[in-house]
Design a protein with these regions (language model features):
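RNA-contacting regions in translation and RNA-metabolism proteins
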Residues: 1-44, 56-93
Length: 93
C-alpha cells in the first residue's frame, strides 16, 4: 500500500532548504486522508510558489498517488501557529 505521508515527504524535501524541519501530520478516516504539512518559515514560499503554483502541483501529484491507492487525500500547508494548534501540548513544564 502507498504511504501517502512518505510520498509527500519525498516531494517536499528536495524543494526546501531545511528538509530536516519538514513535519507531516497524517489523519485518516476510512478512505479519506488529511496530510498537514509544515516547513521552516523561510521555506514556506518555496512550497507555496508564485500564485500557489507549487502547492497546486504538490496537491495534484498527491491526488494521483491517492487515487492509485483508492484513497482521497487533502494536503493542508500549515504555518507555525497552525501547527502548534494541531499538535497536542506536552506535559513538561
Amino acid at each position: 500500500m502507498i504511504e501517502l505521508k512518505e510520498v509527500l515527504k519525498e516531494i517536499v524535501s528536495p524543494i526546501v532548504s531545511q528538509p530536516e524541519k519538514v513535519i507531516i501530520i497524517e489523519e485518516a478516516s476510512g478512505r479519506d486522508v488529511l496530510l498537514k504539512l509544515n516547513v521552516a518559515p523561510e521555506d514556506m514560499g518555496k512550497v507555496i510558489g508564485r500564485h500557489g503554483k507549487i502547492a497546486k502541483a504538490i496537491r495534484t501529484v498527491m491526488k494521483a498517488a491517492a487515487t492509485a491507492a483508492n484513497l482521497h487525500v487533502r494536503v493542508d500547508i500549515l504555518d507555525y501557529d497552525e501547527l502548534n494548534e494541531t499538535t497536542p501540548a506536552s506535559d513538561e513544564e
